[in-house]
Amino acid sequence: RCILRAADPNRMVYWSRGAVQDIYAYSPYSPSIAKEADMTCIPVSLPAEQVQSGADSPAHIGKYGFMYAQPCHITPETDMSEGVSLVFKQLFAIMNIRLKLTPDCALNEIPVIRMKLESAASALAYDKATVNMTTEDGIPVVTPGSSSNNIVLKFAENIILNKENYVSFYMMVAPGIHSAGDLNLEVIARDNSVYSVDIAAGVNIEPNMVYVRDFDLSLDSFVPADPYQIE
């Protein structure tokens, strides 16, 4: 359901006869921002630190996203009888990292406490940015303010890797072009040992897409931390 209200409660929303009305929609909505709304520079952010609640759970992804609809330009007396259709898309993309232990791994289970995705090419997260919703093709343009080339995914509880099934980890990432080897993935185990791999294939991360990468890890793949410390 979409409800139209005036940004100022003391004002009314009305249609100007014969005038084209421009309708923009996005989420999350901030009343404090909407009062001074400028569709050419809507504030947006994508945290460089994200928290997943548990194994295979994408429940956290929604709070990091920014949804937008293709703008509608209508003339009330001729177009309103057909209503206004708003189709929402995601401004960012989802990276689904799937991990499993190799059959010959010396351990049947390895608990992991966090992971990091880093790019040598472009930003993966925005501390501050703005979005222009008024582009001719209706595809928003992001102007970064301050950005980060890495995303750290933490877990509400330790997640256990096993030999039987892939375990899914989800990150919300910013669009960008990454050539072969630009992206590096680190997986940190409970003993602080680190599995690190450069993602061989290049990827052009586009909005509203899901990217899946599978990795099989052996015990020897983890480099011990110095000094050894259990978290």
Model-identified regions with their sequence ranges:
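Short, low-hydrophobicity acidic/polar segments
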Residues: 1-109, 162-166, 191-193, 198-199, ...
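Contiguous beta-strand segments of beta-sheet-rich domains
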Residues: 22-25, 115, 182-183
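Compositionally biased regions
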Residues: 46, 54, 120, 147-149, ...
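Short helix-loop boundary/capping segments
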Residues: 81, 95-165
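Extended serine/threonine-enriched, polar tracts that run as long, contiguous segments within proteins
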Residues: 96, 117, 154-196, 200
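Extracellular/surface-associated beta-sandwich interaction domains
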Residues: 114-138, 199, 203-210, 215-231
